[in-house]
Amino acid sequence: MARNKGGLRFQPSGGARGPAIPVGKKQRLTIERLAHDGRGIAHEAGMTWFVSGGLPGEELEARVLGARSKVVDARSERLFSSSDLRRREPCTVAGRCGGCTLQHLEHGEQLALKQRTLQEQLQRFAGIEPEEWAAPLVGPEFGYRRRARIAVRWDARARRLDVGFRASASQEIVAFDECLVLVPPLQTIARALPALLQDFRKPESIGHVELFHGTASALLLRHTTALVDEDRQRLAAFCSAHQAQLWLQGAEQPLPVEPAAELGYSLGDWQLTLAYRPGDFVQVNAPVNESMIRQALDWLAPTADERVLDLFCGLGNFSLPLARRVARVVGVEGVAAMVERAGANALANGLGNAHFFQADLSKALAEAPWAEQGFTAVLLDPPRDGAFEAVREMSSLGARRVVYVSCNPATLARDAGEMARQGYRLKRAGILDMFPQTAHVEAMALFEAG
């Protein structure tokens, strides 16, 4: 379910303090290897340096962003020697924008880094390795994001509205001419958006903007004070010109300006359409999402007469394709609104064999009424915190096969260790390249009862 983008960031290491290093200081370094978050690692004068933009083997000059204990966070500013792994970034704000952190690294090496991260985390936290490594699931390198959040900030002193993406390791807003990772319809809207917002009569009322694309395009504007009619009309005309729905959000939940407006996305292989609202979790990469569902169902390999449990089911992204194949699917989710929408999606797609329940998945499952008859096949798609309490009960649920989809290799590895303690074997694992140009790792693992 809901993911927070991230990776290994600056963390104090504890122990004796190293020499004080002022922010802004420049240091010549040789990069030794990559951290899991894609930053280069170097050692100098007893300090470990994490350098954004550095690649193994490179000699560079880095500027200090922050330092504590024996760890320094820095950014590459000048190259003396370049790695063969380096490529020219196609984006004009790469290195400044906080969205794409790996554009300077060849895509094949991005995949290798993510594979290495998964392998090392499984070894570190669980001491295990899968019997088989699956090939990475990949999609387009660019033009894949169907959702984006654009930062907006009114500078009262300068009488200026800043519109763009958050910078890496700061609160700066980086303006952009185009964003290459967005799907083309959202690129068009994003390119025209700054000029629209900067013409607002009351730009200080804008909080941020989110863009969505699926069965329709949509623009959500979060406002901190009521919009004046003139600005509201500008927004409506802009959205009409770009064939996009307009949604507004004040202190309450997002609401469409046109009450009949609906957002959704299609899963063509299963002839499904799933409705959602701004704020609901939806995978941002449509091609990889479909490949992920296909692989999950292939690995789980449910028979037509099986009961399948889908934990952290959300809108029914896995539940409804499963319901096309098996006798009964039970989806469980912690957020009541998502449970309601999953049920509505099942009904809208004519699936009477998918049933959804709300439950706190950090607590015991075996006592729940929906769990009484047990399940031989289970699918989990938890948030970054993982599913430790749920996996502790896999054997009591009767699960013979478990597919675990993860957005955090560290918690997947921790939970894999618990699965191993219950007698499950890690049959297969692999990465899902849901976020090309970033170090974010999604993964899938198949466990079978021993």
From Swiss-Prot:
Key word Translocase present: no
Active site: C407 (nucleophile)
Catalytic activity: uridine(1939) in 23S rRNA + S-adenosyl-L-methionine = 5-methyluridine(1939) in 23S rRNA + S-adenosyl-L-homocysteine + H(+)
Chain residue ranges for the region called Disordered: 1-22
Annotated keywords: 4Fe-4S, Iron, Iron-sulfur, Metal-binding, Methyltransferase, rRNA processing, S-adenosyl-L-methionine, Transferase
Residues that coordinate or bind S-adenosyl-L-methionine: Q283, F312, N317, E333, D360, D381
Protein name: 23S rRNA (uracil(1939)-C(5))-methyltransferase RlmD
